[in-house]
């Protein structure tokens, strides 16, 4: 009897936690009116995670613990859309919008319909998806794909905070109804600040070009835990399946907000072209101040009965259209071209421009990408050039106004030597860019490595800015990141703009950085292709720098998410002549060259075994199961090979299980795995 009361109390606590967590999630992300701190929110979530781990029977399909991620999927099965997800026809001028409005008016008048109100919404630059809810609970999420068939990415969409896992109770005349299947369509996107933060965690050569590319790549990641940390958002713009099929589109957007969705809030019911044109003009100016990218305005007839009347072509509906904002452009004069050297030696041409206003800010520099792009443009010093900003953080030069070329225009002298150290530059076969091979002696590369080492996502050394690093390198005070930890206050006080207080702050910040994790240090070392996520995997698989240095290319490639290219890059880094001295300095500086606080093994049942998980586990997510193996002396690998010691097969295990059986490897079930714990 006592046991039943306890079970009821635990079930009620879990239900209350789920309601509270989703309420606070909605307040934070959708309404931007948080009521509690991040710390208190995390405590609620951790308590629910604890309850569900101790009592798996309490887990529900709409539990917010699913947002944390952890499930790993091998593939994204195809799904058929209930109705085709058509793309919209584009227009690029107000004149074309007027033509669309007139055309729609004629078609409706032919049917005896005079009302033609339109809803104007911002067009988000993201990835279109469809969400299916059954009895108010999210059951499926899919990409648009080819319009008729997309990919099932439910496991990843569950991690997006603005995707409600259960629809909120609706006190509204536009009820969703009981037992109904409701479809919500919208766009998954990444905010500007989150895009910048993500790129900051990635090696220079692996950075995303824009937020849309980052979003598309993230949605197809196989590890939902990695999707969760990338902070995607979902904006809803379509609702189908409500009780009254004639509910106007404007009211459907309001209903989506009531149900817990983020709509952006910037939509308007327009009575005619004058109001449409005003909406377009307003957001052409104000869009640059939004926290996300928007590249236009979508116009839809408000009366959904007219949607059926007008129908659609094979590609797009006749009742809606997208107005695409022209990329913001400005004309200015090219003053000079300078060549920058990155921390990995890549040489990038940068245009220095006569300052000009563009998209709400003053622009004086612009990227030219690489030498081939410069040749394509035919650019010369003194030219009038057109620069463009269409969502990118850095504007780009798109063309030269050759008819305005001055008589004294000069050719751009392409360097044959590194502008920082005069070493002859080289170009690898198949590569677009040139680079400086003087890794050890090039001051520009050293400056880049120091700044990367000190950056927020690496060792997070406060007060170590670009101007100070430039002086440290120029005066020979640092030759690698290890030298930072042996700087003395008197040395720093002698530098420009460095008084006693500033010098003291730098030394204190360096000392505080010693407490950063081993995984952060691995990222800070700046190994080519090793971003934050890869550094974490390396730290798990090789718990000390000595173990990592001793690992062969094959052993490295066997680690989760590390293939032969990254493995080769790691080996090449350790084999570089200067690395041995750097590691010695880091040891002397008492930096974390091993995993923090190694715990004594709970048992040795997995000691020395390389373990592969395949299929879905019932009682563990992939991350927690991996931790259990690591705590017992094992190592997690992602691929099956002759060296694999153990394969744990869950539900729907696929090709990895087949390969393991062919190789005669030891394969166990989840029950046998738990017995080994």
UniProtKB/Swiss-Prot annotation:
Record's protein name: DNA ligase
Keywords assigned by UniProt, alphabetized: DNA damage, DNA repair, DNA replication, Ligase, Magnesium, Manganese, Metal-binding, NAD, Zinc
InterPro entries to which the protein is assigned, alphabetical: BRCT_dom (IPR001357), BRCT_dom_sf (IPR036420), DisA/LigA_HHH (IPR041663), DNA_ligase (IPR001679), DNA_ligase_AS (IPR018239), DNAligase_adenylation (IPR013839), DNAligase_N (IPR013840), Hlx-hairpin-Hlx_DNA-bd_motif (IPR003583)
Cofactor(s) named in the record: Mg(2+); Mn(2+)
Domain of life: Bacteria
Similarity comment text for this entry: Belongs to the NAD-dependent DNA ligase family. LigA subfamily.
CDD domains found in the cross-reference section: BRCT_DNA_ligase_like, LIGANc
Active site per database record: 123 (n6-amp-lysine intermediate)
EC assignment: 6.5.1.2
GO aspect biological process, one term: DNA repair
GO molecular function: DNA binding; DNA ligase (NAD+) activity; metal ion binding
Amino-acid positions noted as binding Zn(2+) in the UniProt annotation, renumbered to this chain: 418, 421, 436, 442
Domain BRCT: 601-677
PANTHER family named among the record's database cross-references: CHROMOSOME TRANSMISSION FIDELITY FACTOR 18, DNA LIGASE
Function: DNA ligase that catalyzes the formation of phosphodiester linkages between 5'-phosphoryl and 3'-hydroxyl groups in double-stranded DNA using NAD as a coenzyme and as the energy source for the reaction. It is essential for DNA replication and repair of damaged DNA.
UniProt keyword Metal-binding, yes or no: yes
Residues where NAD(+) binds: 38-42, 87-88, 121, 144, 187, 300, 324
Cystine connections: none
């Amino acid at each position: 009897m006592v046991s039943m009361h306890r079970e009821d109390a635990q079930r009620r606590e879990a239900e209350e936690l789920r309601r509270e967590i989703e309420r606070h999630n909605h307040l934070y992300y959708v309404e931007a009116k948080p009521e509690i701190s991040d710390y208190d929110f995390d405590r609620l979530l951790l308590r629910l995670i604890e309850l569900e781990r101790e009592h798996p029977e309490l887990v529900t399909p709409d539990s917010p613990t699913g947002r944390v991620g952890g499930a790993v999927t091998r593939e994204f099965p195809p799904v058929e859309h209930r109705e085709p997800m058509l793309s919209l026809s584009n227009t690029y001028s107000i004149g074309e919008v007027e033509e669309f409005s007139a055309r729609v008016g004629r078609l409706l008048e032919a049917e005896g319909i005079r009302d033609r109100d339109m809803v104007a919404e911002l067009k988000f630059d993201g990835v279109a998806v469809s969400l299916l809810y059954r009895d108010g609970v999210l059951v499926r999420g899919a990409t648009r794909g080819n319009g008729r068939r997309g990919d099932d990415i439910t496991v990843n969409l569950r991690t997006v905070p603005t995707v409600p896992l259960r629809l909120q109770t609706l006190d509204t005349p536009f009820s969703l109804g009981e037992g109904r299947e409701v479809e919500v369509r919208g766009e998954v996107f990444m905010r500007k600040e989150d895009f910048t933060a993500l790129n900051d965690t990635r090696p220079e050569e692996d950075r995303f070009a824009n937020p849309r590319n980052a979003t598309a790549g993230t949605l197809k990641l196989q590890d939902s835990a990695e999707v969760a940390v990338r902070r995607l958002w979902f904006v809803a713009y379509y609702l189908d399946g409500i009780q009254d099929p004639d509910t106007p589109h404007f009211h459907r957007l309001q209903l989506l907000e009531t149900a817990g969705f983020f709509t952006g809030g910037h939509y308007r019911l327009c009575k005619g072209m004058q109001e449409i044109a005003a909406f377009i003009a307003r957001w052409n100016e104000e869009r640059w101040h939004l926290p996300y990218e928007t590249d236009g305005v979508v116009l839809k007839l408000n009366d959904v009965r007219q949607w059926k009347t007008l129908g659609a072509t094979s590609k797009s509906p006749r009742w809606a259209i997208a107005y695409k904002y022209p990329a913001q452009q400005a004309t200015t004069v090219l003053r000079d071209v300078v060549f920058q050297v990155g921390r990995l030696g890549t040489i990038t041409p940068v245009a220095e421009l006569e300052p000009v206003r563009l998209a709400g800010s003053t622009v004086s520099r612009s990227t030219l990408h690489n030498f081939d792009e410069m040749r394509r443009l035919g650019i010369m010093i003194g030219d009038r050039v057109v620069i463009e900003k269409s969502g990118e953080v850095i504007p780009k030069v798109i063309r030269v106004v050759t008819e305005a070329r001055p008589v004294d225009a000069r050719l751009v002298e392409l360097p044959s030597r590194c502008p920082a150290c005069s070493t002859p530059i080289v170009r690898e076969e198949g590569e677009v860019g040139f680079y400086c091979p003087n890794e050890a002696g090039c001051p520009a590369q050293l400056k880049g490595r120091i700044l990367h080492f000190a950056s927020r996502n690496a060792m997070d050394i406060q007060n170590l800015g670009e101007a100070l690093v430039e002086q440290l390198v120029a005066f020979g005070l640092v030759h690698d990141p290890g030298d930072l930890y042996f700087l003395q206050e008197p040395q720093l006080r002698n530098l420009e703009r460095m008084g006693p207080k500033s010098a003291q702050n730098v030394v204190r910040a360096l000392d505080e950085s010693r407490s950063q994790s081993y995984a952060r240090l691995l990222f800070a070392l700046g190994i080519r292709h090793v971003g934050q996520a890869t550094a974490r995997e390396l730290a798990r698989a090789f718990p000390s720098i000595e173990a990592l240095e001793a690992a062969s290319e094959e052993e490295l490639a066997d680690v989760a998410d590390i293939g032969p290219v990254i493995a080769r890059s790691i080996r090449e880094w350790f084999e570089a002549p200067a690395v041995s001295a750097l590691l010695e300095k880091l040891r002397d500086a008492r930096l974390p060259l091993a995993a923090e606080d190694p715990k004594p093994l709970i048992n040795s049942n997995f000691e020395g075994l390389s373990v592969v998980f395949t299929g879905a586990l019932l009682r563990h997510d992939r991350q927690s199961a991996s931790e259990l193996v690591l705590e017992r002396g094992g190592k997690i690998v992602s691929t099956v090979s002759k060296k694999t010691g153990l394969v744990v097969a869950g539900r729907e295990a696929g090709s990895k299980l087949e390969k393991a059986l062919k190789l005669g490897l030891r394969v166990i079930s989840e029950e046998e795995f738990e017995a080994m714990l």
